Structure formats: structure tokens, C-alpha cells
């Protein structure tokens, strides 16, 4: 995993997310502590457990976005899941142990990609030989092969069609559900795993251009050079030591104290999460995986429920609490302008593909931010997601007619904002009284 300092992690998150300094600092420290733990002696390393985080804040303020950006930054097995997906063991639905199984699958993909890069040079050479075999046959003289090799490397025969033998995946075979086996890979029996050898080594002839065959053959040759046992071992080690799970919508499985009733399944999910977060061993088809050092970051809006409505034991296992603040008009203005891929940058780029140049003066950006804040205040506060609604309504006409206006420069004015989005704000007050 990357050895970024907390300051570097925060500055990287700042490129994409406005504000929320406390949340950024908390995840930066947690991520750095993963690296610090790796530097300790083995005896002490086992004792240092991750300090799990609970992020609390209204919807649309950046909780999920922090998770998405952290995933790209961490270069460690990372999984983002919604707590609402899961049900208590014994109920229909996924049980929480599938989180770790999915995390292992993610780690395997990462590990294979990393190891493929290491053997890439040899795989490229082997793939080149296979292309030459398809072009001139394996009995051609060395001079002929050398001549074609030169043409191949110079790209002169990229468009030539060849027939190569590639592995036949044959499409995924259907899976069967075995009731009453929650520990056995989600109760799923995969026929590919049983008959893998019989089906996996079949090849089929495929016709493709020399250029297209390159990526297919390099990947195949790289996979032949990988030691699958080593890949699995490294992936499980990565999950156990560096795995990060982001549990979104945790508030949806908390039952408000005055509404406790038939929601057994929701509280059951919390109970099932306890051992997972505290540290347990989960059975996967690749072997047992310990979760003692997996970092859990939970987040929720807590509109109807409060953090105190979570089971006390679960609260205790999420010791670091971070509150994310609601966004105001000033924040909205910064969101529209500052991030690298801000909404305004995205819309400008999209319409530039049609030859239309969009311009947003400062007062227009202010008007968009103000009207988004106004609607959030009068209907339902959905945070920065309201900007999507406002901009879509504002640019709807321009987007529709863009193909006929190629070469034009369109200045989006404050008056256009009032004219096209003002009605949305005017209706907002009444909408809450309409059934």
C-alpha cells in the first residue's frame, strides 16, 4: 500500500472534495496508521488494532465521495457496501460475512494485476511468438520469422486477420443455491469450481486482427506465468493487514428507540456485524480470513435514528466519531468551481464535444448556489446533489439544441437561472403540503 503522509492524503482529498476537514483528517490518520503498523515488530504488530470510524452527517455532504477517493488512494483491498443490503442470518438475503468474501475477490483482482505487470515483458515476448506462429507457422525459417517480426513491431501488419487458439471460458456456468449453508460461500455451489480443470483448459480458434490479438494473448501468457497459489496467499495477507471496508447507510439498520418492534432483522444485522468488526475468522473458498486488522469506516445521515440507537456494543467498536457539516451557499459555489472535475467543468466538456462553448460568469455561479440552498431549505436537504438537479434544469434547453448550435459561445446569465430554475424554488414551499 502507498506510504502517503496524513498531510498528503488530505491534500489529495482536497482536490476533489470541498470542506469536511475533520473527516479528511480522521481517514488520513487511519490510513497512515496502517502503514505505521507494518513497520512494527511482529509481536507488537498483532496487538495494534485499527480504530474504526463512524462518519455522521446529512446526505450529500461528501461521506460517500470521501470513500470513493480513498479507495483510489489506498491501493489496498477496499470495499464500499451499503448496510441495507444485508439481512440477519436465517433471513432471505445476503449475510454480512459476504463483505469479507467480496473483499478477498477485490484483493485477488488487485494482486493479479500487480503480478501481471511484473511478468509483462516475458508475456509480451511469448505473445509475439504466438502471433508469428499464426502468421507464418511454426515451421517457417528463422529468416522469414525475423522478417515478419520486424513488420509486426513496426505495426505494418496490424490490420491483417489471423486465427489464434485462445482459452474458452465458455461463459459462466449457472450457480445453485444450497439452503441452510450460510458459511459455505453464501450457500452457493459454483460448478466452475468443481469442474474447473475440465472446462478451464479448453481452447477455441478465434479470428481477429493482429492488433486486437495482442492484448488477449499478452493477458493469457501473463496468467500462465502466475502462480495461483502465490496470488491467493498474497491477496489474503493484503486483506488481513490492509483491508478497508466502507459501510454506508449504517443509520438505516439502527432502529429509533420509540419505534422498536418487528424490526428483528435490522437489529440482527447489527449483531452480525459485531464479531466482524471486532475480529473473527471468515470462511471463504480460498481459505480462512481473519478480520482483526480490517479497518471499518461506517457512515450514515442519522436523520430519523441517532447514533445512540445503534447497539451499544457496535458504538463501542466504532470509537472515532466525525461529524460532517451541512453545506451552505458558499460551499456550493466552491463545489461548482474548485474540484478538478467540478460540475461546471463536466458540463463545459460535454457540450464542447458538440462544438458549443459554455461560459459561467461569477454572478451566475452565485445564483446557482443560492437557489440550490433555497430549495434545500424549503423541501428536503439533499446537500450537493441538489446542484445536479439545478444544473440539469438550467441547461436542459441548451443540451437539447446543442447539435444545431455548433460553433456558438453561450453565456449562462443570472437571469437564465431565475427564469429556468426560479419556478422550481417557487413551487418548493407548496410541494411539502401536497399529498
UniProtKB/Swiss-Prot annotation:
Please give the Pfam families that the UniProt record associates with this protein: AAA (PF00004), AAA_2 (PF07724)
Q: Which UniProt keywords apply?
A: ATP-binding, Chaperone, Cytoplasm, Nucleotide-binding, Stress response
4Fe-4S keyword on record: no
Any one GO MF annotation of this record:
ATP hydrolysis activity
Localization of this protein: Cytoplasm
- An example Gene Ontology biological process: proteolysis involved in protein catabolic process
* Keyword check for Chaperone: yes
Give the CC-aspect GO terms: HslUV protease complex
* Chain sites annotated for binding ATP: 18, 60-65, 248, 313, 385
At the top level, the lineage of the source is Bacteria
Q: Which InterPro entries match?
A: AAA+_ATPase, ATP-dep_Clp_protease_ClpX, ATPase_AAA_core, Clp_ATPase_C, HslU, P-loop_NTPase
**Membership in a protein family:** Belongs to the ClpX chaperone family. HslU subfamily.
Give the record's subunit note: A double ring-shaped homohexamer of HslV is capped on each side by a ring-shaped HslU homohexamer. The assembly of the HslU/HslV complex is dependent on binding of ATP.
PANTHER family per UniProt:
ATP-DEPENDENT CLP PROTEASE ATP-BINDING SUBUNIT CLPX-LIKE, MITOCHONDRIAL-RELATED (PTHR48102), ATP-DEPENDENT PROTEASE ATPASE SUBUNIT HSLU (PTHR48102:SF3)
Function of the molecule: ATPase subunit of a proteasome-like degradation complex; this subunit has chaperone activity. The binding of ATP and its subsequent hydrolysis by HslU are essential for unfolding of protein substrates subsequently hydrolyzed by HslV. HslU recognizes the N-terminal part of its protein substrates and unfolds these before they are guided to HslV for hydrolysis.
Q: What is this protein called?
A: ATP-dependent protease ATPase subunit HslU
Instruction: Give the encoding gene's name.
Output: hslU
